């Protein structure tokens, strides 16, 4: 069962996910990658280019090259690295721009810490895969930028966003669906993730300290100890706002926290975090449905449930429950992982063009209104799902 799953992951990665971006998204005219393909498979060559998409392409192809050693993946990763450094990196103030126009000129120059985290994730993975010193140098620079400008030495944690020059910004939101709060679970999760990866290749004392601190923030501030769900939005003093449960973030955080503790290699910390990992994954399973998929979120104030099945939530569900099987021998979790993979194959994979669709709606209809590739729709969640199950 486990071996069949791995064979299917290799096939998914190498035939449906990775070729799609190599064949359709490389912008030969203006450099880097196109900004968008619609859910109807229409390329938008003049769409804006997002830092997150570029950084996630960099991570995905670097990791695929590290795992499989194929030269075309290295070329794709190198293209993403070059474009990130030459166009997204702000050589005057540090950090990365949020977006560029299709020609590669800065558009939204704000410093969204989440995006800088992904740049570190991609660059550190490229260094891990190739030994490239330039990628590590820029990853370390960006780490220093986050620590210098975003870290709150007084109240702890990291602020959400700043202006290009690292000053206060009125609208800190990562996206339109987010609350305008200073500290968020999502940004902390996606600082934990690149810091973990950077620590694999750069054993710096401050980085180590901040990685320990981030794990502590999750267990002490972000985790709701009563429900074992993650709280999503906080004011500067860590007071939780807007009680919403995000099942996909719960299951994603469960394995990323576990990974961070393992990479630090501290047996005491691992022993401390393992019960937390299991509790968060158990809480996330409230979002699983009888057909194997995982729904999006629940508003605890109104009781409203968003029952759509987003592509990224399904990918993280496969990884998160497989993690419980891999490290704790949990057969029930393996079944959750397999069931969700079967759900993905039934409902989300595009057998005609490749890649996955954005979501299956709660009413059972396929969502083709949202992007097939774009600012938020990247090869990272589903690519990483395959890479995680094939690795170790």
Curated annotation (Swiss-Prot):
InterPro entries: 6-hairpin_glycosidase_sf, 6hp_glycosidase-like_sf, AGE/CE, Cellobiose_2_epim. Keywords: Isomerase. Its EC number is 5.1.3.11. The keyword Lyase does not apply. PANTHER family: N-ACYLGLUCOSAMINE-2-EPIMERASE. Catalyzes the reversible epimerization of cellobiose to 4-O-beta-D-glucopyranosyl-D-mannose (Glc-Man). Can also epimerize cellotriose to Glc-Glc-Man, cellotetraose to Glc-Glc-Glc-Man, lactose to epilactose, and mannobiose to 4-O-beta-D-mannopyranosyl-D-glucopyranose (Man-Glc). May function as a mannobiose 2-epimerase in vivo and be involved in a mannan catabolic pathway which feeds into glycolysis. Belongs to the cellobiose 2-epimerase family. This is Cellobiose 2-epimerase. The gene is bfce.
């Amino acid at each position: 069962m486990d071996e069949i799953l791995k064979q299917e992951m290799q096939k998914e990665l190498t035939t449906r996910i990775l070729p799609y971006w190599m064949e359709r998204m490389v912008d030969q005219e203006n450099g880097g990658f196109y900004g968008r393909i619609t859910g109807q498979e229409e390329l938008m060559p003049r769409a804006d280019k997002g830092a997150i998409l570029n950084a996630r392409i960099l991570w995905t192809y670097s990791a695929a090259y590290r795992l499989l050693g194929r030269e075309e993946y290295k070329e794709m990763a190198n293209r993403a690295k070059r474009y990130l450094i030459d166009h997204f990196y702000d050589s005057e103030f540090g950090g990365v721009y949020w977006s560029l126009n299709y020609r590669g000129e800065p558009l939204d120059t704000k410093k969204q810490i989440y995006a800088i985290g992904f740049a570190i994730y991609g660059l550190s993975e490229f260094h891990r895969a190739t030994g490239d010193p330039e990628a590590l140098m820029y990853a370390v620079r960006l780490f220093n930028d986050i620590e210098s400008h975003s870290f709150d030495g007084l109240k702890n944690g990291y602020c959400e966003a700043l202006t290009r020059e690292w000053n206060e910004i009125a609208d800190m939101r990562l996206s339109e669906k987010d609350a305008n709060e200073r500290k968020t679970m999502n940004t902390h999760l996606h600082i934990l993730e690149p810091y973990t990866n950077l620590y694999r290749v750069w054993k710096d004392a401050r980085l180590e300290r901040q990685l320990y601190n981030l794990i502590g923030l999750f267990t002490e501030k972000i985790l709701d100890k009563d429900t074992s769900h993650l709280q999503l939005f906080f004011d500067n003093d860590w007071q939780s706002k807007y009680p919403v449960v995000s099942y996909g973030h719960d299951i994603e955080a469960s394995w990323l926290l576990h990974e961070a503790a393992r990479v630090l290699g501290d047996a005491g910390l691992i022993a401390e975090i393992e019960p937390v990992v299991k509790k968060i994954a158990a809480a996330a399973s409230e979002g699983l449905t009888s057909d194997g998929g995982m729904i999006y979120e629940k508003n605890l104030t109104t009781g409203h449930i968003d029952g759509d099945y987003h592509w990224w939530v399904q990918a993280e569900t496969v990884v998160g429950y497989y993690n419980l099987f891999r490290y704790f021998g949990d057969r029930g979790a393996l079944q959750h992982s397999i069931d969700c993979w079967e759900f993905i194959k039934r409902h989300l994979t595009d057998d005609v063009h490749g890649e996955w669709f954005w979501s299956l709606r709660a009413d059972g209809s396929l969502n083709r209104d949202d992007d097939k590739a774009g600012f938020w729709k990247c090869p990272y969640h589903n690519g990483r799902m395959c890479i995680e199950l094939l690795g170790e």
